[in-house]
Amino acid sequence: MLTLYSYPELFGVADNNGYGLKVYAFLKLARVPFVHEHVFDASAAPRGQLPYVVDDGETIGDSETIIAHAIAKYRLTIDAALSPEQRRTNHLVTRMLDDLYWVMSYSRWKDDRYYPAFRDAFIAQHKQIDADGFEKAKAYNSQRYHFQGIGRYRCRHLRLHREYLLLSDPDAAEDVR
């Protein structure tokens, strides 16, 4: 049986990471039987990143690769009726949401307006993580944001980038440059 390894739940959502939640939702919608294991330590994961699955002894990382694996292995037809235009729309929305993940994650870990509430809620729900451990996770994520690029934005520009990604103000992209 397929086992999904992802970050733990938070705020009533099955996974507090958008990529893990994407895989979880896909597996549920496609009715693929699976076991869901919540982990904090991603060191066993491919490239040290969650989510990943183990399926009949094969370890697969990356949310889109996991979904492609499930479609092929279990002969899923969940998207079979989509037209070419609908497939393009699906791809564009998926890319937008994947880009938006970084902005939202940054808001949780680096934006002082949101970080205290996120930290306190996380520690309250997951007692095995203390403030020191959480600060280490914050430092780790800060490095990830820098190397990904989102950590090099100024906060005002990051908000404009988020608005642009959400298509609420397409002209905001000019201000980000």
Where are these regions (language model features)?
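GST-like fold's C-terminal all-alpha helical module
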Residues: 99-177
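GST-like domain detector, emphasizing the conserved glutathione-binding G-site
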Residues: 1-131
